[in-house]
Amino acid sequence: MNHTFKGYLIEFFIVFIGIAASFFIDAAVKKNEKVQLKNVLLEEFLLKVEEDIEQLQNIQEILARCKDSSDILIDDFYNQTLSEDNLANEYLYLSQNMGISFYPQNGLYEQLLESGKIELIVSSELRILLSTIYEHYEDRNSALTRTLDDFFLTSFTNVANDIIVFSQSSSENQIIYSGTRVKTYDISSSYYTSRDIPAFYSESQNLIRFYADLMDNYAKGFKELKLLIKEELRFQS
């Protein structure tokens, strides 16, 4: 009887170990599948980051040109260094391009979050950077964009009595948001005595600087993000 009991006990342990091993193997396989899917998403992420970097570089170039225009227009207001044609050109570029916005592609980040795959990322540095770029920077981006929109609604109305520039499409300039040129303009005789004009240029300059600083942060973040994603893929390849 004792011998029979021991036999049953051994069989029980064998079956138990088999079931436990089966569960362990199944869990390991499922985790491996999730890791592989996470890696696929990260590989796609790299492609999207490259596209965003290209878009970002265009925006940074435009913002730098807007900063130059605001400097030129402020200097002209106090020193009258520009012809009316050049004044109209600089004003048109500034007014049509300073409101440019950057929209990073965040669909894959949302997918990582919603699927729980982000928790499978080994590098805590990578997880933190993803949150910084696609949440913290995005919040700042949205806030600055709203500020720019509000600024446009009020400021252009304020300066409309002093300067109006009409534009038309230009095939010569293919940069985003800037493919227009002056068609005609109306600059009032009170332009150089207006208080609204320098206030408009000064605030434009400040907002351009704030947005350019944020774009610099994005650029640094994307550069680091590429490196960290590649390290993650090498670690779990």
Feature map (PLM): residue ranges:
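Hydrophobic membrane-insertion alpha-helices, especially the h-region
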Residues: 11-24
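Long, hydrophobic alpha-helical segments that serve as membrane-spanning/inserting helices
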Residues: 1-2, 6, 27-237
